[in-house]
Swiss-Prot record:
Residues 37-60, 223-264 are annotated as: Disordered. One of the primary rRNA binding proteins. Required for association of the 30S and 50S subunits to form the 70S ribosome, for tRNA binding and peptide bond formation. It has been suggested to have peptidyltransferase activity; this is somewhat controversial. Makes several contacts with the 16S rRNA in the 70S ribosome. It comes from Neisseria meningitidis serogroup B (strain ATCC BAA-335 / MC58). Residues 50-60 have a biased composition (Basic residues). GO terms for biological process: cytoplasmic translation. Keywords: Ribonucleoprotein, Ribosomal protein, RNA-binding, rRNA-binding. It comes from the Bacteria. Residues 229-244 have a biased composition (Basic and acidic residues). One of its GO terms (cellular component) is cytosolic large ribosomal subunit. One of its GO terms (molecular function) is structural constituent of ribosome. Residues 39-49 have a biased composition (Polar residues). The keyword Mitochondrion does not apply. This is Large ribosomal subunit protein uL2.
Length: 277
């Protein structure tokens, strides 16, 4: 894929950068793998806002993606690469030799016609899924499980990947894009290569309306609110924050560590912010 800078034919097009999608399938998605997706607009069952800045947006179906890749030893042919509105990565439709079809996260470099396999005996080839114990040290991987059989949870977004650093006993050490080094059970599965659509990070939406299409509502700064609404609010005329940046509920907004899961602390070998002061 490549990117294209749009000509400034209007205010909304000026500065817009898009990802070229010539290689993507232009037809309708595979219907048996679609599910209804209800929009909550950031509200809970009482109608109260639980997540700000959500609402509206285009309706779309959820594409059921196979994160487990548990059809071992059965070759699957890539039928097509598709756009998925639910994630930044593209998805690939696989047709297995027994006739079953499944969606997977499309790895970088995969094209229609490629043949993929999963299982302990699979070759070390981009798109194949194996247990980590069968993957050589130094291999770039993505779609990594955190618990055996649960399905991929790590490195699933566009351009994401991780590197297998070492294997010792029942655990392997994996370095994530954030710099964090984490221990993963060697029976967990991972896919060879990195996620495609790496140019996603270079995209510029060009106008506010593009965010509204995505269901993202405007974000109001705290300094322009009243004191009752935000800790930064109030003052006569334009004033600064007068304190460290915080959320509407007083939680520090810059660099404050919010992780609170001591049960799995021993699985983190090196924290992602270990080089920050």
């Amino acid at each position: 894929m490549a990117i294209v800078k749009m000509k400034p034919t209007s205010a909304g097009r000026r500065g817009m950068v898009r990802v070229v999608t010539e290689g993507l399938y232009k037809g309708a998605p595979y219907a048996p793998l679609l599910e209804k997706k209800n929009s909550t607009a950031g509200r809970n069952n009482n109608g109260h806002i639980t997540t700000r800045h959500k609402g509206g947006g285009h309706k779309h179906h959820y594409r059921v993606v196979d994160f487990k890749r548990n059809k071992d030893g059965i070759p699957a042919k890539v039928e097509r690469i598709e756009y998925d509105p639910n994630r930044t990565a593209f998805i690939a439709l696989l047709c297995y030799a027994d006739g079953e079809r499944r969606y997977i996260i499309a790895p970088r470099g995969i094209q229609a016609g490629a043949v993929l396999v999963s299982g302990a005996e699979a070759a070390i080839k981009v798109g194949n899924t194996l247990p980590i114990r069968n993957i050589p040290v130094g291999t770039t991987i993505h779609c990594i499980e955190m618990k055996p059989g649960k399905g991929a949870q790590i490195a699933r977004s566009a351009g994401a990947s991780a590197v297998l650093l070492a294997k010792e006993g029942a655990y392997a050490q994996v370095r994530l894009r954030s710099g964090e080094v984490r221990k993963i059970n060697v029976d967990c599965r991972a896919t060879i290569g990195e996620v495609g659509n790496e140019e996603q990070s270079l995209k510029k939406i060009g106008k506010a309306g593009a965010n509204r299409w995505r269901g993202i509502r405007p974000t109001v700064r705290g300094v322009v609110m009243n004191p009752v609404d935000h800790p930064h609010g109030g003052g006569e005329g334009r004033t600064g924050e007068a304190r460290e940046p915080v959320s509407p509920w007083g939680t520090p907004a810059k660099g404050y560590r919010t992780r609170n899961n001591k049960r799995t602390d021993n699985m983190i070998v090196r924290r992602r912010y270990s080089n920050k002061g």
